[in-house]
């Protein structure tokens, strides 16, 4: 025997279609409001919320359970249907349903949906006419029952009364919003002007700093040029000094080994780096003084051995 699950499939299809309708409604609303959105993000958020509400409220399981009961009855298994019938006519079930209805009413009242609004929503529905701004007000079965029971009255005085929504002074609200907007606009302009002044001051300081940096760079360039010229002059002076000393050395009646030693010391002077050149000249002068001191001591000792005395004049 073929097992029928058409009712379950229909319920699942209705639930899935409801979810797709919720996604389409959300995206179309965002488009009408001119809000940029990511379809995948909207789809994920709506699915998460939809699944949570359907599961937490028990609506999905309730619908699928009823569909399974109908399919079982269609397949010749009436046990579940009989149990559901007995459960529905049980006094405890009726009391529980009545309690749930009362909870829902209190929840709606706490949300600001009073009895008048609940009754009107239950008695009437609005049908839009495509292509027109007007609508058709339809009476529900509850309204029909109230008419049959004589629970509907016509109050002519109610027409002249103003509804609560009509008592709102939209002009004063508009004026208040306009004042708030002007105040906000003034604050924004003040902040913008202050920011502009700060930006101008920063630019002035930046230009002043750039001028100072430019002047310092020019001074540094001049000093660098002067240092380069001084270094070149010192190199020329040291080179001239070495040449002059070499020429003077060759003109003196000194032993060749002494001349060679002094010439080697002169040639070892670093003529490129003035600092090193000064150190080399200092070392050469010390060596000459040391050699002169040794020569003087030798001459002094020789005079003493010869029983001669010496004196400075």
Curated annotation (Swiss-Prot):
Residues 166-237 form a coiled coil. Gene3D superfamilies: 3.30.70.1610, Nonstructural RNA-binding protein (1.20.5.970), Rotavirus non-structural protein NSP3, N-terminal domain (6.10.280.20). Residues 1-149 are annotated as: RNA-binding. Residues 170-234 are annotated as: Interaction with host ZC3H7B. Its main location: host cell. GO terms for biological process: regulation of translation. Keywords: Coiled coil, Host cytoplasm, Host-virus interaction, RNA-binding, Translation regulation. It comes from the Viruses. It is found in: Host cytoplasm. Residues 208-313 are annotated as: Interaction with host EIF4G1. The keyword RNA-binding applies. Residues 150-206 are annotated as: Dimerization. Pfam families: Rota_NSP3. One of its GO terms (cellular component) is host cell cytoplasm. The keyword Transmembrane helix does not apply. GO terms for molecular function: RNA binding. Belongs to the rotavirus NSP3 family. Plays an important role in stimulating the translation of viral mRNAs. These mRNAs are capped but not polyadenylated, instead terminating in a conserved sequence 'GACC' at the 3' that is recognized by NSP3, which competes with host PABPC1 for EIF4G1 binding. The interaction between NSP3 and host EIF4G1 stabilizes the EIF4E-EIF4G1 interaction, thereby facilitating the initiation of capped mRNA translation. Homodimer. Interacts (via the coiled-coil region) with host ZC3H7B (via LD motif). Interacts with host EIF4G1. This is Non-structural protein 3. The lineage of its organism: Viruses, Riboviria, Orthornavirae, Duplornaviricota, Resentoviricetes.
């Amino acid at each position: 025997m073929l097992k029928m699950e058409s009712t379950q499939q229909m319920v699942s299809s209705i639930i899935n279609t409801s979810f797709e309708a919720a996604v389409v409604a959300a995206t179309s609303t965002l488009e009408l409001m001119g809000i940029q959105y990511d379809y995948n993000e909207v789809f994920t958020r709506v699915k998460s919320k939809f699944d949570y509400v359907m599961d937490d409220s028990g609506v999905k399981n309730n619908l699928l359970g009823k569909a399974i009961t109908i399919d079982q009855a269609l397949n010749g298994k009436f046990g579940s249907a009989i149990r559901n019938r007995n459960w529905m006519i049980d006094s405890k079930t009726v009391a529980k349903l009545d309690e749930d209805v009362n909870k829902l009413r209190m929840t709606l009242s706490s949300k600001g949906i009073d009895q008048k609004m609940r009754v009107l929503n239950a008695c009437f529905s609005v049908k839009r006419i495509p292509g027109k701004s007007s609508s058709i007000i339809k009476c529900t079965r509850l309204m029909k029952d109230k008419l049959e029971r004589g629970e509907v009255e016509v109050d002519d005085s109610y027409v002249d009364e103003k509804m609560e929504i009509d008592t709102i002074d939209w002009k004063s609200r508009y004026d208040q919003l306009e004042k708030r907007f002007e105040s906000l606009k003034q604050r924004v302009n003040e902040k913008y002007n202050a920011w502009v002044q700060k930006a101008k001051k920063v630019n002035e300081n930046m230009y002043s700093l750039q001028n100072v940096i430019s002047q310092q760079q020019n001074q540094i360039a001049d000093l660098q040029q002067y240092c380069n010229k001084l270094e070149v002059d010192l190199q020329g002076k040291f080179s001239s000094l070495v040449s002059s000393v070499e020429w003077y050395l060759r003109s003196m009646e000194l032993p060749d080994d002494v001349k060679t030693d002094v010439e080697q010391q002169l040639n070892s002077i670093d003529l490129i780096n003035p600092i090193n050149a000064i150190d080399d000249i200092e070392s050469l002068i010390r060596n000459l003084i040391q050699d002169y001191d040794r020569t003087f001591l030798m001459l002094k000792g020789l005079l003493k051995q010869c029983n001669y005395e010496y004196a400075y004049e």
